[in-house]
Amino acid sequence: MYYWNKPMETIGREDLERIQLERLQRTVLRMYTNVPFYRERMQQQGVKPEDVQSLADLRLLPFMDKRDLRDNYPFGTFAAPRQEIVRIHASSGTTGKPIVAGYTANDLQMWAECVARGLGCAGVTKKDTVQVAYGYGLFTGGLGLHYGVERIGATVVPISAGNTKRQLMLM
């Protein structure tokens, strides 16, 4: 069987849950410290970052929905300083204001790694060619898949949508 990142893809349950808890605690502390909206919502629920001691404690965190994201448009939910944001993506906004997501350089590296793992599970290797037909605009799909394919070392055909005849020619 092929693994892109064998240590992470074959990690034991106990180690996986330890990593998940560490990352959850780090994320909760970062959003509590850096994002007034999240801090206020947590305070309304009577939750502090140190209350998250297990994965089951995820249930203590306040539920947030699309409306909350739209109400804090465009940058009210960013946990990183704006000068660390290297890319912005957004939803189409068909139900109101678009939902905006800002990515740091590290976010993009992690995103490419996660996509590479998924592609590796599907059997993609550096010997393959992957045609990316997702859009390359504000939607996150096109670039996310693109950089995951490149991380594996496979060839990317960044065709986006449309141009069916050209797509067939390149395949």
Language-model features, listed with the residues they occupy:
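Short acidic, glycine/Ser/Thr-rich loop/turn "cap" segments at secondary-structure junctions
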Residues: G96-Y103, K127-A133, I152, L168-M171
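Conserved aromatic-histidine-acidic binding/catalytic patches
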Residues: Y103, G137, I159
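Conserved AMP-binding loop of ANL adenylate-forming enzymes
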Residues: G120-G148, I152-A154
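Nucleotide 5′-phosphate-binding alpha/beta core
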Residues: M1-A90, T95-E113, R117-C121, T125-K127
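Conserved adenylate-forming
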Residues: R26, F37, G142-M171
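Short glycine-enriched loops at secondary-structure junctions
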Residues: L108, G135-L138, G162
